[in-house]
Structures are given as structure tokens and as C-alpha cells.
Amino acid sequence: MAKKRIVVMYGGKADEHSISCISAASALRALDTDKFEAIPVGITKDGKWIVNGENPLGWSLDEGLPTVEKTPGAKDVVLEVALGQDGFFAREDDGTMTPFGHVDAVFPVLHGPYGEDGTIQGLFEMMGVPYVGCGVLASAACMDKHYTKVLLAAAGIPVAPGITLDARSFDKASEFKTDADAIMAQVSEAGLQYPLFVKPSRAGSSFGVTKVEHEGDAAELAAAVYEASRHDWRILVEQGIDAREIECAVLCPKAGEAPQASWPGEIVLDKRAEGDDQFYDFDSKYMDAAASHVEVPANLPEETLNLVRETAKKAFVAVDGAGLSRVDTFVTKDGKVMVNEINTMPGFTSISMYPKAWEATGVRYTDLITKLIEGVLR
């Protein structure tokens, strides 16, 4: 049987560019090469699609954070939308076009805006090209934490208390210092309890997230809102929840099938090298191996673990999920579960929760990739 030709995409214009590269490298190494022929396609930070660039198989977190560059020998990728699955070409130096051949599916291992937000999913929908992952609606809604909460709340799924701010009306020149009292008034009116977490609505990997600990400190709050605004003008201010953060991997390779949920896992934060405890920020996730470790299943009663699994599946269905997602939840001391956010293209690095959770549930990394791809093949 002929191998299926799969375009694996990585990089992109988002802040998560390098993590996407590492995720794709891990996925490519795990790909069943007896079944699939992979064509790696990178997207540079300025949005250029290239093929035959640097080989991503050599990338790992141990070597730092890679970026997609147009190296000598790399070719621009050109799409002919009307040709659908036969519409992928590499532009040669003399301007001629070399076809990829029939592309059976695309695996967009892209995180953040322009990759995980419904835009590229819409492109492949227009081309009629099968792709791994959530569709346009779920991708767009889950990229925006505000609208994720709107959908979940409408489905009766508990979410953290919070408010949403529009930073476009704030004074950027003063770094929002002149808006500090007005921002504080909105938080006070909502009755939010400290600590607060201020985060961009449409960013991932903890970019722009700040913990605000001092109640009544308008300057600290305004500074946190300004930091978040560097990534997005829509900003969430959420009440900190006295709970454990438990993550659950959801898998639904074929449209219309019931989603499956892994054993829930927990990122256990360890002391940082400098001796400080802190929340799970970008450095804790990717740059400091001593900052945390993963436990799957999480050390919780089985009844609570099953409640997390059921909540994750309900959340996945509520946003019209497809393919895969990682549902992040809060579990309180009395066993209540609320959803924090949904990642429609979770990390696939060697330390990422999604593949680790499925491995602990009995699905090997290679089999996981195979299930995801075969689920969308025609």
C-alpha cells in the first residue's frame, strides 16, 4: 500500500513559534514512516511558507529555541487553492513550480494566532484539504479565552470568575498608569478576590500572564494589564482559584464519534533554582527542567479524576471540538471542577502533557499520531 503524503506544518507568526517547531520535531520523529510520507513545511516569523529548509528532526528543547529561516536550498511554498489536495507547489529558483504531489492531509502543528485560531483551518476548508485538529469555530473560540468562557458558561460548565477589558481605550503612552484607578474600579465592582491573574485573551504558553497579589495596588494591576496588552488588546482579569491545575487530554480522531479522555495529569511545580515559588510561566514550561515535573494520573481520588474526564469531554463537545484538545481545569479542595481553558493544538514536545497523558493511559506516542492522521483521511 502506498504511503499517505502528510504535510506537517510548524513555526508561524505567533509568540509560540519556537514551541511549534519543537512540537513538530517530536511529532515527526514519532511518525510511522511505514504508513506516512512527511513533507515538513515551515512558516517563518514573517509568514513565509518554505519547504526544504533546515531539517526539524534535529531540533529539541535541549538545543534551545529554534526558528524557521529561509536557508540556502529552501523553496517558497505556493498554493493553488482551486486544485485542492493537488495544489501544493515549491517555487524553484528559475520560477518553475514543482508539485508536492497529492497531499492526503495536513497536520498543522501550529500554536497561537494564525495557526490555532481558525485562520489556517479556514484556508484548508476552502481548499478541501483534510487536516488534523479542530475546525474553524472551535479553533477561533478556544484561541480567545473570553469566548471560550462564554461558550462554556452557556453549556453550564463552571469557569473562573473574572472580567474582560478592552485595552484599546487605555493610554498606552503612560503604560496605562493614568487608567489605573478606572481599571481598579472595574475589578472592585466585579468583587474579584486576590490574587488576580491578568492574561491576554488570545495568547498561549503563558505569554503576557501576570499574577497580581497586592489588593488595592492600582499601579501593580495597571502594570499587569499593560504587560498583557503587549500581546492582545482583549484582556482577562481573573480571580485566582485556590485549587490544583489538572489537565486532561481529549481525543476524537473521526468527526461525529464520541470523544475520549485520558487520565488527567498535573504539572507539579518544584522550587526554582533561585528558591522562589511561582506559577507555571513560559520559563517553567520550557526553559527550566528543574522547575516542574508531570504526574499522570494526578494524585487525586478516582472519583475526582473521572469527574475531570467527564468535564473535559463536555467542554470539548460544547465548543464543537474535533481531533484533539487539552482541557485545563481547576480542582478545588472539596472536589469541584471548573474549566480554565482549552488548547485545540496542545504542545507535542517531549515534556508536553498531551502525549504524556495518553502514554499513561495506554496510547503510545506513535499510535497517537497515527490515530489523529488516519481519522481525517478520505
From Swiss-Prot:
Record key words, sorted: ATP-binding, Cell shape, Cell wall biogenesis/degradation, Cytoplasm, Ligase, Magnesium, Manganese, Metal-binding, Nucleotide-binding, Peptidoglycan synthesis
All copies of domain ATP-grasp, residue ranges: 149-374
Binding site for Mg(2+) 1: 328, 341
PROSITE patterns on file: ATP_GRASP, DALA_DALA_LIGASE_1, DALA_DALA_LIGASE_2
Residues annotated for ATP binding in this entry: 189-247
Pathway entry: Cell wall biogenesis; peptidoglycan biosynthesis
Cofactor: Mg(2+); Mn(2+)
Main localization (coarse): cytoplasm
EC number: 6.3.2.4
Cofactor binding, per record: Binds 2 magnesium or manganese ions per subunit.
Catalytically driven reaction(s): 2 D-alanine + ATP = D-alanyl-D-alanine + ADP + phosphate + H(+)
Classification via InterPro entries: ATP-grasp, ATP_grasp_subdomain_1, D-Ala_lig_Van_CS, D_ala_D_ala, Dala_Dala_lig_C, Dala_Dala_lig_N, PreATP-grasp_dom_sf
Keyword rRNA-binding: no
Function per UniProt: Cell wall formation.
Family according to the record: Belongs to the D-alanine--D-alanine ligase family.
Name of the protein in its database record: D-alanine--D-alanine ligase
Organism: Bifidobacterium adolescentis (strain ATCC 15703 / DSM 20083 / NCTC 11814 / E194a)
Taxonomic placement: Bacteria, Bacillati, Actinomycetota, Actinomycetes, Bifidobacteriales
